[in-house]
């Protein structure tokens, strides 16, 4: 249909194009109704490459040039190499021969069953050293069309005029010092201000079908990432949420940012055609600002499945663990008996080789420094003990090591400031029939990194949850038997013991199975999720007192806002009822509740660290009353405004009621004659004051019975 036909059809239907906002039109995922989008324009060239039919063919160059007598021997060597990397089709290897000299030309074509096998063979064999003089150069057959179309004369790129972008930190300058949160329900993704003064969220941005799976904030809150079948996209701003960059990675399933937001890692897995084979995994690392792909990694899910809490198709996520701090200098991958640490300057291995650590099963970076902790379980049937070690990067020097005996399992927990490392150690009893738990506590910032051993009062108690106080020196442990475990608080330094761990208190028989510290410390929520149906206890650890107890029935998620002033509890669509979220104050006062059908996700927008020095923050804390007067006055104004709004609302309701009563009386009067005719002329609409009420009393004798009582 041409433009003229469209205009004619619109005129016939009475549609005024000037009144139509095309930016507000959103189509369901995968449906374009024949309208080409800007995404299709970007990926059109790439899509056409997959339709050539030669995607399963590779070209291997730098082969030896041999005569006819050695042809079969060379062909056998090449087949032996590439049969390990994929299935070569029958007659799928062709080695051209010079018709005059009868010598091979030094290259060959190999056709595999699938494009995936061809791509894998290219990745694995490019640079393969057959001997000193012959190092393979491998390309996809389809690449030659692209290379042949390169113009011989270089044309300088056209300079684009500079267009200043939006201030991506503008949302931090909100006059009311509010925080933003994003929610997903049904097809909609919505961003709100958390406006507790108004007892309701203030809408910022809403878009249906904004993402095809989930959304995720970057660690410092600058970007919001969405996932699509073509790849990932990041958006930014305080309220506009304009698209800043796209990252091409077909059917992306997971993303992860580096701590300083410089890099974005995307993940895609593909199920194999043969159920016995492992899934194929492709991971790409992009520069967030430029969109340039810095490195990609490909392989089977088995190669990416060691360590970590789990992911998609058997691969652990995140596959790459980023070193602490905002420099984004190093990231590591755990493989079988190997730890590969890469530097982002060249995106290659440090010292061009991986660290060999036999039987290593878990690694964890310090949140602030380039220190890597690792856990190696027992080997040789217990003859070789388990160990936890701290390794400095990039020097790979071992800073500290602790051997552990009779170990069943270990979990490592870094404190947010990188000052402490807690290692929960599950050990076998002497009979090997059960386990008990304890902690190895590393003081990272102290000389020689001293280690303390902590055992619970009842070492047979099962440890249900552990959590460090953010930016603090305390930690909490839930331990004991369900449904009423105990909660204990410990401190790494007290006024009496600055260098030893001390127990502060134990709370007996609590309905809790999860711990949620405030981001600023001091306050913690003892939460009973899942089987406990959303029991909440807001606890002040400084005073060791409960501030409030509450319940959010069937709550599945709890998340503090980045300032520690408010906390959100949510019931997601895993439950069919009561979907939505509730906002609470830090001390357990419910502020407002929002119900949303098919509610999937809630995430607060993170804030970057404060630019104020510790001394300046301490100074502000001392003079807080001076600053608080302004906000107290604003709160009072808002309270008066809300009261006035409530009065206006009640007044409007009263006027509406009185209007309805007058309408009813008017209608009643109009129908008076009709009612009188229906009652044969009897006038029944008589006011109450025309009647006289009399009170009449009467007695009715029902029965009489006589009894003779004898005196004793």
From Swiss-Prot:
Q: Which InterPro entries match?
A: EIF3B, eIF3B_RRM, Nucleotide-bd_a/b_plait_sf, RBD_domain_sf, RRM_dom, TIF_beta_prop-like, WD40/YVTN_repeat-like_dom_sf
Q: Does the keyword Acetylation apply?
A: yes
Annotated Gene Ontology cellular component terms: eukaryotic 43S preinitiation complex; eukaryotic 48S preinitiation complex; eukaryotic translation initiation factor 3 complex
Q: Name one Pfam family in it.
A: RRM_1
Gene3D superfamilies referenced in this protein's UniProt entry, alphabetically: 3.30.70.330, YVTN repeat-like/Quinoprotein amine dehydrogenase
Signal peptide span per the entry? Answer: none
A molecular-function term among this protein's GO annotations? translation initiation factor activity
Keywords, alphabetical: Acetylation, Cytoplasm, Initiation factor, Protein biosynthesis, RNA-binding
Which residues are reported to carry the modification N-acetylmethionine?
1
Q: Which GO terms describe its biological process?
A: formation of cytoplasmic translation initiation complex
* Localization in the cell: Cytoplasm
Residues covered by the RRM domain: 56-143
Family statement: Belongs to the eIF-3 subunit B family.
Under the subunit heading, UniProt states: Component of the eukaryotic translation initiation factor 3 (eIF-3) complex, which is composed of at least 13 different subunits. Binds to the translation initiation factor TIF3H1.
Query: What is its biological role?
Result: RNA-binding component of the eukaryotic translation initiation factor 3 (eIF-3) complex, which is involved in protein synthesis of a specialized repertoire of mRNAs and, together with other initiation factors, stimulates binding of mRNA and methionyl-tRNAi to the 40S ribosome. The eIF-3 complex specifically targets and initiates translation of a subset of mRNAs involved in cell proliferation.
Which PANTHER family does this chain map to? EUKARYOTIC TRANSLATION INITIATION FACTOR 3 EIF3 -RELATED (PTHR14068), EUKARYOTIC TRANSLATION INITIATION FACTOR 3 SUBUNIT B (PTHR14068:SF0)
Give the protein's recorded name: Eukaryotic translation initiation factor 3 subunit B
**Native organism:** Arabidopsis thaliana
- The protein's gene is named TIF3B1
């Amino acid at each position: 249909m041409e433009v003229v036909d469209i205009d004619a059809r619109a005129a016939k239907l009475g549609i005024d194009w000037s009144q139509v906002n095309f930016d507000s039109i959103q189509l369901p995922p995968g449906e374009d109704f024949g309208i080409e989008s800007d995404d299709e324009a970007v990926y059109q060239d790439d899509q056409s490459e997959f339709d050539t039919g030669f995607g399963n063919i590779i070209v291997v160059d730098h082969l030896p040039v041999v005569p006819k007598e050695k042809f079969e021997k060379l062909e056998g060597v090449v087949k032996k190499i590439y049969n390990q990397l994929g299935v070569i089709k029958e007659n799928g290897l062709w080695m051209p021969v010079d018709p005059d000299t009868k010598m091979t030309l030094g290259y060959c074509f190999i056709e595999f069953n699938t494009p995936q096998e061809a791509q894998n063979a290219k990745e694995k064999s490019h640079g393969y050293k057959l001997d000193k003089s012959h190092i393979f150069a491998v390309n996809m057959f389809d690449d030659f069309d692209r290379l042949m179309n390169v113009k011989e004369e270089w044309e300088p790129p056209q300079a684009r005029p500079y267009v200043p972008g939006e201030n991506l930190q503008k949302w931090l300058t909100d006059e009311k010092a509010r925080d933003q949160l994003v929610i997903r329900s049904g097809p909609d993704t919505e961003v709100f201000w958390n406006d507790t003064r108004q007892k309701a969220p203030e809408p910022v941005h809403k878009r249906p079908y904004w993402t095809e799976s989930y959304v995720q904030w970057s660690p410092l809150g600058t970007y919001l990432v969405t996932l699509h079948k073509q790849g990932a996209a990041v958006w930014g701003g305080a309220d506009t949420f304009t698209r800043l960059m796209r990252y091409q990675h077909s059917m992306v399933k997971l993303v992860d940012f580096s701590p300083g937001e410089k890099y974005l890692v995307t993940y895609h897995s593909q199920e194999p055609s043969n159920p016995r084979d492992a899934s194929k995994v492709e991971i790409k690392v992009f520069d967030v600002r430029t969109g340039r792909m810095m490195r990609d990694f490909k392989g089977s899910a088995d190669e990416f499945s060691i360590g970590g809490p789990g992911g998609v198709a058997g691969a652990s996520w995140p596959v790459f663990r980023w070193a602490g701090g905002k420099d984004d200098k190093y990231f590591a991958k755990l493989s079988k008996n190997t730890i590969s640490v890469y530097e982002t300057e060249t995106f290659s291995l440090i010292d061009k080789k991986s660290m060999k650590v036999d039987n290593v099963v878990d690694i964890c970076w310090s949140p602030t420094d380039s220190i890597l902790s690792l856990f190696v379980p027992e080997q040789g049937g217990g003859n070789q003990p388990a160990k936890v070690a701290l390794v400095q990067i990039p020097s790979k020097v071992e800073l500290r090591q602790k051997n552990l005996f009779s170990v069943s399992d270990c979990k490592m927990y870094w404190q947010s400031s990188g000052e402490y490392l807690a290692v929960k150690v599950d050990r076998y009893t002497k009979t090997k029939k059960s386990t008990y738990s304890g902690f190895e506590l590393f003081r990272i910032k102290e000389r020689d990194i001293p280690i303390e051993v902590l055992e619970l009062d009842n070492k047979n108690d099962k440890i249900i949850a552990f959590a460090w106080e953010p930016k603090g020196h305390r930690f909490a442990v839930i331990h004991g038997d369900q449904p009423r475990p105990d909660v204990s608080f410990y401190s790494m330094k007290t006024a009496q013991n600055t260098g030893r761990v001390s127990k502060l208190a134990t709370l007996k028989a609590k309905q809790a199975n999860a711990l949620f510290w405030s981001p600023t410390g001091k306050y913690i929520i003892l939460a009973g999720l899942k089987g406990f149906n959303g029991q909440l206890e807001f606890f002040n650890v400084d005073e060791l007192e409960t501030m409030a107890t509450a319940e959010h029935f069937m709550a599945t998620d709890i998340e503090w806002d980045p300032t520690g002033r408010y906390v959100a509890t949510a019931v997601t669509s895993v439950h069919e009822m009561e979907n939505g979220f509730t906002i609470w104050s830090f001390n357990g006062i419910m502020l407002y509740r929002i119900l949303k059908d098919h509610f999937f996700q809630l995430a607060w927008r993170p804030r970057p660290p404060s630019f104020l020095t510790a001394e300046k923050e301490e100074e502000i804390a001392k003079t807080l009353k001076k600053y608080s007067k302004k906000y107290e006055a604003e709160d009072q104004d808002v309270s008066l405004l809300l009261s006035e709004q409530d009065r206006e609302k009640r007044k409007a309701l009263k006027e509406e009621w009185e209007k309805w009563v007058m309408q009813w009386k008017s209608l009643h009067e109009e129908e008076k004659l009709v009612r009188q005719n229906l009652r044969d002329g009897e006038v029944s609409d008589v006011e109450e004051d025309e009647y006289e009420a009399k009170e009449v009393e009467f007695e009715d004798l029902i029965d009489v019975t006589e009894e003779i009582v004898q005196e004793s």
